[in-house]
Amino acid sequence: MGKEKVHINIVVIGHVDSGKSTTTGHLIYKLGGIDKRVIERFEKEAAEMNKRSFKYAWVLDKLKAERERGITIDIALWKFETNKYYCTVIDAPGHRDFIKNMITGTSQADCAVLIIDPTTGGFEAGISKDGQTREHALLAFTLGVKQMICCCNKMDATTPKYSKARYDEIVKEVSSYLKKVGYNPEKIAFVPISGFEGDNMIERSTNLDWYKGPTLLDALDQINEPKRPSDKPLRLPLQDVYKIGGIGTVPVGRVETGTIKPGMVVTFGPSGLTTEVKSVEMHHESLLEALPGDNVGFNVKNVSVKDLKRGYVASNSKDDPAKGAASFTSQVIIMNHPGQIGNGYAPVLDCHTSHIAVKFAELLTKIDRRSGKELEKEPKFLKNGDAGMVKMLPTKPMVVETFAEYPPLGRFAVRVMRQTVAVGVIKAVEKKDPTGAKVTKAAAKKGAK
């Protein structure tokens, strides 16, 4: 058997009616793990409801409805295969929590597929000041999604159909915008497609014979293989802590960076509690080592369940152990906030698995969110659409890191009433040593060896 294909995560972005669902549905339909029987059922229902426009979006609508109703659908439905990769669509932006998910990063996307609607009016709506094309592209870049594929969709609906002139015009406009955001347009494939008719999705289309570049499938194969951060020091934010009879205390979480293995002495930030890892398990199987992306449970010695909680971060005690933050400086973008944000604002921050109120202690600068240039020092307030550097103070002990060193622990969302009002990236952290940190006997013994 050959080497298993590499897994990559894709996020599909773009304006409301650009055809994201149809395009994603088409890929999953043609290349994915959807059972043919399920497809037939959907097709029959679509015909009964007279949804002639069914094609592929219907597949996705059904999956979404089932997902939102809490029916656990087989996640294989969101996967498809290319020659080189197993691709998972980690989120499609119709989803309510799309922006939060992108930031708190249940999984970090390796590539963004930006879908553009080139029809007259459609394109202008997407790229206008309020259009989501801009916001999504900016978010993707700010959150470290380095690679992008741009699909000029609905080529079957341009005037005239499959218009090269319209495609050229779109490429020019979108390139200049993406350049302002921070992407290098020369490294982006601009693929003219029809998610509905299937042109250039998987096979070359004779309707687009003027286009000589890759199909969408080829472009996905040309993504650079992502480097997984297993060589960095360990960071494992806890999602839960269980007490399991006969075993003891078992913290659970996802390895974000580094590796964890039995026998390692770990320090939990922010409390500084240090102990030895007895065993590491994933899907009820013991592991000799867990890598980034693995969701694991691990058993720790001489530790009570009360000593650990969600939001704590496990780290290697001998390799840059995690500590609490006294304060940190972030670049924040205000998104859906109705009022003004000034010094003293204290919302709840979602950063990795922690959910803690943080005070905006000082607004340091206001910056141009497109270019990053400073516009004003010590602004009185920030409002919708503004970006700025802010010094923040956690109201309770919490672990954060700079985005540059540990990306998953360096980005956050500010949410009020289930609405994301701001997103941020952490630029600097002032750490503090814990007071009275407990070192278990097992850890002390290990350290003395």
Swiss-Prot record:
Name the protein family: Belongs to the TRAFAC class translation factor GTPase superfamily. Classic translation factor GTPase family. EF-Tu/EF-1A subfamily.
Binding-site positions, GTP: 14-21, 91-95, 153-156
Q: Is Nucleotide-binding given among the entry's keywords?
A: yes
Question: Residues where N6,N6,N6-trimethyllysine occurs?
Answer: 79, 187, 306, 396
List modified residues, type N6,N6-dimethyllysine. Answer: 55
Residues of the region (G2) are 70-74
Its recorded name reads: Elongation factor 1-alpha
Q: Which GO terms describe its molecular function?
A: GTP binding; GTPase activity; translation elongation factor activity
Where is the organism placed in the taxonomic lineage, from the top? Eukaryota, Viridiplantae, Streptophyta, Embryophyta, Tracheophyta
SUPFAM superfamilies in the cross-refs: EF-Tu/eEF-1alpha/eIF2-gamma C-terminal domain (SSF50465), P-loop containing nucleoside triphosphate hydrolases (SSF52540), Translation proteins (SSF50447)
Localization: Cytoplasm
Q: Does the keyword Protease apply?
A: no
Which residues does the annotated region (G1) include?
14-21
Tell me the residues on which N6-methyllysine occurs: 261
Q: Where is this region: G5?
A: 194-196
In this chain the tr-type G domain maps to 5-230
Give the coiled coil ranges.
none
Q: List 5-glutamyl glycerylphosphorylethanolamine occurrences by residue.
A: 289, 362
Give the region (G3) as residue ranges.
91-94
Q: Which domain of life is it from?
A: Eukaryota
Q: What does this protein do?
A: This protein promotes the GTP-dependent binding of aminoacyl-tRNA to the A-site of ribosomes during protein biosynthesis.
Q: Where is this region: G4?
A: 153-156
Q: Which UniProt keywords apply?
A: Cytoplasm, Elongation factor, GTP-binding, Methylation, Nucleotide-binding, Phosphoprotein, Protein biosynthesis
Identify one Pfam family in the record.
GTP-eEF1A_C
Q: Which GO terms describe its cellular component?
A: cytoplasm
